[in-house]
């Protein structure tokens, strides 16, 4: 960014751009509000934004900073934007020099925050004046040159440090990813003895005695001195701007552009010149990159003669030039999302407002305060020629992009059509309707999936229809509630379902009347089991879906007889609810909507693949009118907290669940029920005595608890709260009444009993699988023994027939013994398919048991 100083008799002025705003810094001996100037120096700042309606810059806000130095001469050195190491945010800064009579120079670096408040980030004193080579880098870090040495000071250390590298000049300084703060400049290098024996010319000595190097300020060592700029350019390069860097085989490769004394803009890539542009003016001094959108990148070059030009990066041709400028800024001034260049002309800094300027992106965006008085030649005479060279490739690229876009659109439309038809066919199949959605032409285009034969489709339909069951057999009731921003749908199943439940999924398919597509809503499932027993032993099973511990009894013929741990005696009645919780906010975009509730049950039968069963539970209808009237909204009346049992299950499904193991080595935990009933004002739910409903006013109201005291000194406490804040409040209240040296442990995977049962189940499954291996071997051994007995019987018949000829018995007996010995030495083999099936089952079961053991060990 190029900024020039405009100075009057009693003030100094600098401008820069930040987030689309123009910041005007003024250092004066007075206040804007005071008519008479004072002796106290004041630094003022004005934020100005461009108004697209009036096409002028208007003042947005102001700020000031008082400098308590009356007898000193103050001067603005520079201003720009750098990153603060504390936050990593780019903020505007300004450097001020203070000179006293004793030739002591003090420097201040002030950072401007969004509230127009200044913060002094760095201050230091020097015995000399910084005249050239002043740069401010991220940190902030100030770098300058004095005599033939370079120095820097950082806001992190606050100490002046000299650069150890013997640089004759520094062309670029900045931060490179993974390398930190680096310098790029010319460094003097020593010639070899052979080169010193020769007598090179002055020009050759100037060229080959210096080399461009990349120097790290952190490690204070040279990172690279190759693949930068060839030595032949060392005497003519005046300015460098690094575009990109990468490390290839531990070697730094750099892509950069450079300005030369020959009035050229040269592009270098890995030390090789790629493009050259002859600039229209002399003495170039700075380069800025402008992205005007649509892949149009420009290099905006500023000149000492108050001129500027724009060079197109793609063709490396001059696109525009301007004369008689005072400042060139690049930012998104009009808020279009792309960058523009702001050209301030010479007379624009003489008043409080910007009077003479132009904003352009070298395309459609053009704003000018005085278009007739600018005296600028925006484009060269060969502008049309350059345009004709560029437009045809762009048109070809656009045609290719449009063709690809059309193909992609057709592909997406076909996918959407197939998915829509599949959803509709699935819903019709679930509801028992005839599926007439597919035409004969569409059916001909369909191909079987996974390499199946065509005749297998009918078999699949028969199996699928068998898997769909009537909801009256398994589902007793369906209900739904609205809690805060969640929709809770619950399904009460019959007692027979829980005895064979391995894995369930409750899905919601949204059906819109005006659209044939069905949308699967994202849901969070939970299985809740509550006991209706009046005695205090809790039977709330905090189990995950599909994880029920069961006891497997091994029999000699390797058949499994299963009895589930969660199966209680007939006196212990248990209510089972399967819930699905989904976000309500996306559904509010519809005035009313309908969802089909589908229950999927996956069962694993012995020795077979998992079998899926589908149950259509019903439909959920909800509208904005129902929500506004509070028809399904869950509330807590003061006199009757739980009006319906569905409300209780909705709370258990939607609330945040936390499980804690409480252990008291020295004292019995008799105070837990006192805490629940007296301190927390809990009421026991009559239908489910294990659940406590908190009626304490405030944020505690509505919180649910379950307490299972396993021993007098240990128990499991489960808290269902609206959020974690309420949960922490409950724990804070609980700690006050617990005995001394009491321990609380968060059980992230649920209660310990559940994990123990799950561990037992997985170990027993592993034993069953291993027994199948031994049973296969036993089966082959049994067949072998039967063959031996048959062979023995045949030999006895032969011996009886030849009893009258005893002289021939001995050879046959020897032959029989030889055959037995031969068969006993034969290796017993199991078929390869059976062996692979058994080993796969063993690996799966062992993996599950190891996972369960790991969870249990982490408690």
Curated annotation (Swiss-Prot):
GO cellular component annotations of the record: chromatin; cytosol; Fanconi anaemia nuclear complex; nucleoplasm
Q: Which UniProt keywords apply?
A: Acetylation, DNA damage, DNA repair, Fanconi anemia, Nucleus
Compartments where located: Nucleus
Quote the InterPro entries the UniProt record gives: FANCB (IPR033333)
Residues found modified as N-acetylthreonine = 2
Note the superkingdom of the native organism: Eukaryota
Q: Which GO terms describe its biological process?
A: interstrand cross-link repair; negative regulation of double-strand break repair via homologous recombination; positive regulation of double-strand break repair via homologous recombination; replication-born double-strand break repair via sister chromatid exchange
Q: What does this protein do?
A: DNA repair protein required for FANCD2 ubiquitination.
Pathological association: Fanconi anemia complementation group B: A disorder affecting all bone marrow elements and resulting in anemia, leukopenia and thrombopenia. It is associated with cardiac, renal and limb malformations, dermal pigmentary changes, and a predisposition to the development of malignancies. At the cellular level it is associated with hypersensitivity to DNA-damaging agents, chromosomal instability (increased chromosome breakage) and defective DNA repair. Some severe FANCB cases manifest features of VACTERL syndrome with hydrocephalus.
Q: Describe the protein's quaternary organization and the partners it interacts with.
A: Belongs to the multisubunit FA complex composed of FANCA, FANCB, FANCC, FANCE, FANCF, FANCG, FANCL/PHF9 and FANCM. The complex is not found in FA patients.
Its protein name is: Fanconi anemia group B protein
Question: Which species is this record about?
Answer: Homo sapiens
User: Gene encoding this polypeptide?
Assistant: FANCB
């Amino acid at each position: 960014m190029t900024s020039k100083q405009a100075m009057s008799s009693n003030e100094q002025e600098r401008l820069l751009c930040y987030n689309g705003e123009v910041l005007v810094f003024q250092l004066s001996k007075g206040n804007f509000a005071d008519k008479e100037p004072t002796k106290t120096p004041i630094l003022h700042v004005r934020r100005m934004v461009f108004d697209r309606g009036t096409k002028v810059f208007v003042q947005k806000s102001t700020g000031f900073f008082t400098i308590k130095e009356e007898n000193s001469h103050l001067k603005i050195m520079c201003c720009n934007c750098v990153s603060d190491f504390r936050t990593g945010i780019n903020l505007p800064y300004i450097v001020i020099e203070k000179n006293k009579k004793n030739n002591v120079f003090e420097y201040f670096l002030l950072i401007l925050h969004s509230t127009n408040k200044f913060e002094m980030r760095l201050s230091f004193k020097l015995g000399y004046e910084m005249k050239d080579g002043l740069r401010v880098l991220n940190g902030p870090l100030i770098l300058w040159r004095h005599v033939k040495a370079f120095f820097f000071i950082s806001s992190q250390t606050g100490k002046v440090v000299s650069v150890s590298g013997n640089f004759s000049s520094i062309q670029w300084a900045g931060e490179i990813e993974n390398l930190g703060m680096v310098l790029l400049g010319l460094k003097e290098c020593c010639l070899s003895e052979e080169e010193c024996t020769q007598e090179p010319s002055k020009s050759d000595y100037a060229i080959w005695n210096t080399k461009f190097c990349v120097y790290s300020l952190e490690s204070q060592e040279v990172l690279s001195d190759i693949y930068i700029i060839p030595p032949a350019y060392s005497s003519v390069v005046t300015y460098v701007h690094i575009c990109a860097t990468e490390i290839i085989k531990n070697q730094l490769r750099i892509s950069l552009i450079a300005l030369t004394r020959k009035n050229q803009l040269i592009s270098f890539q890995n030390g090789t010149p790629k493009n050259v542009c002859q600039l229209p003016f002399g003495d170039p001094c700075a380069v800025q990159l402008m992205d005007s959108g649509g892949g149009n990148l420009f290099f905006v070059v500023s000149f000492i003669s108050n001129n500027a030009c724009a060079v197109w990066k793609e063709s490396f041709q001059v696109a525009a030039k301007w004369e008689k400028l005072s400042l060139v800024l690049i930012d998104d001034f009009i808020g279009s999302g792309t960058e523009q260049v702001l050209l301030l002309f010479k007379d624009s800094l003489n008043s409080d407002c910007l009077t003479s300027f132009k904003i352009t992106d070298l395309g459609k965006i053009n704003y000018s305060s005085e278009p007739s008085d600018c005296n600028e030649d925006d484009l060269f005479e060969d502008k049309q020629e350059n345009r004709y060279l560029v437009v045809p490739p762009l048109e070809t690229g656009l045609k290719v992009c449009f063709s690809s876009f059309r193909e992609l659109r057709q592909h997406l439309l076909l996918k959407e059509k197939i998915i829509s038809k599949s959803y509709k066919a699935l819903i019709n199949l679930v509801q028992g309707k005839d599926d007439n959605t597919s035409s004969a032409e569409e059916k001909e285009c369909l191909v079987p999936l996974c390499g199946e034969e065509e005749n297998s489709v009918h078999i699949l339909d028969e199996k699928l229809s068998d898997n769909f069951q009537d909801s009256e057999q398994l589902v007793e009731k369906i209900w739904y509630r609205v809690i805060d921003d969640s929709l809770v749908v619950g399904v009460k199943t019959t007692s027979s379902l829980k005895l064979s439940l391995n894995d369930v999924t409750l899905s919601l398919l949204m059906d819109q009347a005006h659209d044939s597509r069905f949308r699967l809503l994202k849901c969070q499932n939970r299985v809740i089991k509550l006991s209706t027993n009046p005695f205090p032993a809790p039977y709330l099973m905090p189990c995950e879906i599909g994880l029920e511990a069961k006891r497997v009894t091994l029999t000699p013929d390797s058949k499994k007889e299963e009895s589930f741990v969660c199966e209680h005696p007939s006196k212990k009645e248990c209510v089972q609810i399967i819930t699905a919780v989904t976000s309500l906010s996306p559904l509010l975009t519809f005035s009313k909507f309908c969802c089909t509730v589908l229950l999927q049950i996956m069962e694993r039968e012995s020795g077979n693949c998992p079998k899926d069963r589908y149950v259509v539970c019903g439909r959920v209808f909800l509208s904005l009118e129902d929500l506004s009237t509070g028809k399904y909204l869950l509330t807590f009346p003061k006199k009757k907290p739980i009006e319906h049992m569905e409300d209780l299950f909705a709370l258990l499904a939607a609330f945040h669940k936390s499980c804690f193991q409480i252990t008291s080595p020295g004292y019995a935990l008799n105070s837990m029920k006192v805490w629940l009933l007296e301190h927390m004002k809990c009421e026991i739910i009559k239908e489910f005595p294990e659940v406590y409903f908190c009626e304490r006013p405030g944020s505690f109201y509505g919180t649910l608890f379950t307490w299972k005291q396993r021993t007098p000194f240990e128990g499991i406490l489960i808290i269902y709260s609206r959020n974690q804040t309420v949960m922490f409040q409950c724990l804070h209240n609980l700690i006050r009444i617990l005995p001394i040296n009491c321990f609380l442990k968060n059980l992230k995977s649920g209660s310990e009993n559940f994990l123990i049962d799950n561990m037992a189940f997985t170990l027993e499954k592993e034993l069953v699988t291993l027994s199948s291996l031994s049973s296969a071997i036993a089966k082959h051994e049994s067949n072998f023994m039967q063959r031996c007995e048959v062979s023995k019987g045949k030999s006895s018949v032969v011996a009886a027939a030849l009893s009258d000829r005893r002289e021939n018995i001995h050879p046959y007996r020897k032959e029989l013994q030889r055959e037995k010995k031969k068969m006993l030495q034969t290796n017993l083999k199991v078929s390869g398919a059976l062996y692979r099936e058994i080993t796969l089952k063993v690996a799966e079961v062992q993996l599950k048991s190891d996972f369960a053991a790991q969870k249990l060990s982490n408690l």
